Amino acid sequence: MIQLSAAQQRAYMSDYLTNGWREERMSFSSVSLEPGYIEAKVNVEHFQMPGDGRFHFSAQSAIIWLSQLGIIYGCWDNQLAAKAGEVYLRDLDLKFKRTINTTQEVRFEGIFPKYCKKQLADGLVYYKNAHFRVESGAFTGTASFLVPIGAAQ
C-alpha cells in the first residue's frame, strides 16, 4: 500500500471540504407549517466561490438545513414553546439528483405523514421516515428524528 505525504493529500483535497464550508452564512427567510408539512426558504448570504465560478448548494449544507426543519417541525408539532433538549437525527437517506445554484429562497420541504410519528414512553417522540425535498426535487430523501418533549406525557 502507498502512503501519501501531506502535500499529496492536500493536492487531491477539496478546498470547500477543507475550509470553504466554514465561510458559509445562511439563514431562513421564511418558515411555514401545517399539520404534516413544513416549508422553509433559505438564503445564502456568504459563500466561498468554487473553482468553476458558480455557487453549488452542498450536500453538507442541505443536511444542516434539513435537520433544522426536523427540529422546528418536531417542536411545533408537539406544542413546545422552545426546543426541550437535543433533537437526534437517527437515519438519513438523501439523493442529489441535480445541482442547486441559486442563493436566494432555496425551497426546503418536509412531509411528516401521521403514521411516521410515534410517542415513546421516555418523553421522546420519534418521527420515522419523514420525506424531504429541496428545490422541487433537486435533492430528495427521508430522515428519522428523536424529539425530546420533556417529561413523559
Q: What are the language-model segments listed below?
A:
Residues L33-P35, T102, Q153:
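A structural signal for the main folded, soluble domain(s) of proteins
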Residues M1-A6, P113-Q153:
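HotDog/MaoC-like acyl-thioester-processing domains
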Residues I72-C116, T142:
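Hydrophobic beta-strand-centered segment that forms part of the acyl-chain substrate-binding groove
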Residues A40-V42, L94, G110, F132, ...:
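Preference for bulky hydrophobic residues occupying beta-strand positions
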Residues F55-C75:
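Short, well-ordered alpha-helical segments
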Residues G36-I38, R90, Q104-F108, L124-K128, ...:
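Residues at beta-strand starts and edge strands
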Residues M1-F57:
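Non-catalytic linker/capping segments at the edges of enzyme domains
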Residues V44-H46, R98, K114, I149:
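Non-catalytic surface loops within mature trypsin-like serine protease
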